[in-house]
Amino acid sequence: MSFFAVACSAPRSSMLLTGLNSSFSDMHRSPLFVFPVTISSRSVKRFAAVSSDSVLDPESKNQTRSRRKNKEAVTPIAETENNEKFPTKVPRKSKRGRRSEADAVEDYVRSSLERTFSTIKEQNPEVFENKEKANFIKDRGVDEEEEEEEEMVVEEEDPDWPVDTDVGWGIKASEYFDTHPIKNVVGDDGSEIDWEGEIDDSWVKEINCLEWESFAFHPSPLVVLVFERYKRASDNWKTLKELEKAIKVYWDAKDRLPPRAVKIDLNIETDLAYALKAKECPQILFLRGNRILYREKDFRTADELVHMIAHFYYKAKRPSCVDKANVTPYC
């Protein structure tokens, strides 16, 4: 059963307290904890009451305040004494670090030279008599080469000034190449192979990989020559000239759209040649759109190339030189 028990006056026998005595509460101003407990009929437990809001002594508060004031009064005096004895800032240490390698090498050379001179003096003291000690380490401020260059300066208005001295020993570049001209390679048939002159005026334009998209991805006919300038130059030159003759035939006809013709140097445009799977030179590729219709690796004359172009682009009869098995049909 539940009872309200007051800890300070709980009897041993079971009893029920419904309230607190008014006189008792007046005598003891401090509130008491009252809580329910279960007490058996045989024994009643004693409980201790503890006040949560105990009244503090006002004198103790005054004592703590006075102690705080005394501490505050003492601390500035102690700080001033410490400031007088010790500096406010810790002085910085001198910078320490590795010396540069150049300084270390210079010190090592100097010390080794001094040791060498001292040993020489001990062995033969007459060596350094009436002679100043040579400075073997070159001074950075003095440069003998600059002094020599300053002495060699010649005025621009000198009448003896040689012509085109920047090119050579007073020889003009034009005079040199007049006496020693650059000769082009001569082919097997006696024709001169002029790759540089062919760039300026040619029926077959040379392109690079950046220009490839504008030429390849177009529905009009395209003939591509993959060649090498300096390897099998005679064969590459002859194939180029035969292709130029065949292209010129269609340009002169004027009754239909002539095919476009470009050439690619295998040694320069390596990535483009790899993409086209062109490993041997010379070879001619017949393209339409983005597809290679046929790959010709053998040498063909201009007449044979005219028939091949007519077959692939203008629906003409297939010539005998075209292998049907290697032709890729255009859809």
From Swiss-Prot:
Keywords from the named record: Chloroplast, Nucleus, Plastid, Transit peptide
Tissues with expression: Expressed in leaves, shoots, stems, cauline leaves, flower buds, flowers and siliques.
Source organism, top-level taxon: Eukaryota
Location of region: Disordered: 52-105, 141-160
GO cellular component assignments: chloroplast nucleoid; nucleus
InterPro entries with a match to the protein in the record: MRL7/MRL7L (IPR044701), Thioredoxin-like_sf (IPR036249)
Acidic residues compositional bias, start-end: 142-160
Subcellular location: Plastid, Chloroplast; Plastid, Chloroplast stroma, Chloroplast nucleoid; Nucleus
Gene disruption phenotype: Seedling lethality due to deficiency in chloroplast development. In the rcb-10 mutant, impeded PIF4 accumulation leading to lost warm-temperatures responses (e.g. 27 degrees Celsius).
Induction record: Induced by light.
Transit peptide per record: 1-59
Biological process terms in GO annotation: chloroplast organization; regulation of DNA-templated transcription; response to temperature stimulus
Residues annotated as signal peptide: none
Coiled-coil ranges from the UniProt annotation: none
Subunit details: Component of the transcriptionally active chromosome (TAC) complexes. Interacts with FSD2 and PRDA1. Interacts with FSD3 and CITRX/TRXZ. Binds to PTAC12/HMR/PAP5.
Alphabetical list of PANTHER family matching this protein: THIOREDOXIN-LIKE FOLD DOMAIN-CONTAINING PROTEIN MRL7, CHLOROPLASTIC, THIOREDOXIN-LIKE FOLD DOMAIN-CONTAINING PROTEIN MRL7L, CHLOROPLASTIC
Function in brief: Plays an essential role in early steps of chloroplast development. Involved in the regulation of plastid gene expression. May positively regulate plastid-encoded RNA polymerase (PEP) activity through binding to FSD3 and CITRX/TRXZ. Involved in redox-mediated regulation of chloroplast development. Possesses disulfide reductase activity in vitro. Required for the proper function of the plastid transcriptional machinery and protein accumulation in thylakoid membranes. May function as molecular chaperone to ensure proper organization of the nucleoids in chloroplasts.
Protein name, as recorded: Thioredoxin-like fold domain-containing protein MRL7, chloroplastic
Source species of the chain: Arabidopsis thaliana
Gene that encodes the chain: MRL7
